[in-house]
């Protein structure tokens, strides 16, 4: 049995921090013109300890960072990612390298087609929170990508179409991944809100 004084417990108690949702993007945007400071950093900045805080703040601020001058190797990309998080294993392995050299591609990730706005991992029970894309070698035309702010879309829907927003917060929608030897499925609402109503 332990006996601790009130004074010791009070001294060791951690004060309750002011509420903040570290995952909530602080600057919602609908076009690149709305981003006041475009988040660009160099690989050299990020491998040094001084750049990590700015990197994470930029991710929190607008949801992404464009990293320039990264060595054209998967190893350099992996090393960079492991500076801020662990790499989660999935059906594709721990760290995936994709190319467009398949004979019969059945996924736009393997082609030179532009990838339309979408959400990855909806078929996983624990979808990715942060994803990294690095074009190591480019010898074809096309394959352009675009980024969208899903949180801005959710907030626009909440304001303009509140009934639709509520439906998308409360109805589970199936996400599926179907291949010859793989079938994954998870059900979840399109939007999720926390106890404070934040998406």
Segments predicted by a language model, with ranges:
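Active-site environment of non-heme Fe oxygenases that use a 2-His-1-carboxylate facial triad
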Residues: 26-64, 69-199
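Hydrophobic, ordered structural segments
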Residues: 1-26
């Amino acid at each position: 049995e332990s006996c601790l004084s009130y004074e010791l417990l009070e001294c060791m108690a951690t004060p309750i921090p002011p509420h903040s949702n570290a995952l909530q993007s602080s600057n919602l945007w609908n076009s690149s013109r709305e981003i006041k400071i475009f988040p660009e950093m160099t690989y050299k900045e990020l491998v040094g300890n001084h750049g990590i805080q700015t990197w994470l703040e930029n991710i929190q601020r607008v949801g992404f960072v464009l990293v320039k001058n990264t060595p054209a190797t998967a190893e350099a990309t992996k090393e960079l990612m492991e500076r801020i998080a662990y790499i989660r294993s999935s059906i594709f392995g721990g760290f995936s390298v994709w190319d467009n050299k398949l004979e019969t591609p059945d996924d736009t990730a393997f082609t030179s087609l532009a990838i339309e706005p979408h959400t990855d991992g909806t078929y996983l029970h624990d979808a990715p929170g942060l994803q990294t894309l690095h074009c190591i070698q480019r010898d074809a035309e096309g394959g352009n990508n675009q980024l969208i702010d899903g949180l801005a879309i959710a907030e626009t829907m909440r304001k303009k179409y509140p009934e639709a927003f509520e439906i998308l917060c409360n109805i589970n929608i199936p996400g599926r991944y179907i291949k010859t030897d793989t079938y994954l499925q998870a059900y979840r609402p399109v939007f999720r809100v926390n106890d404070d109503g934040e998406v």
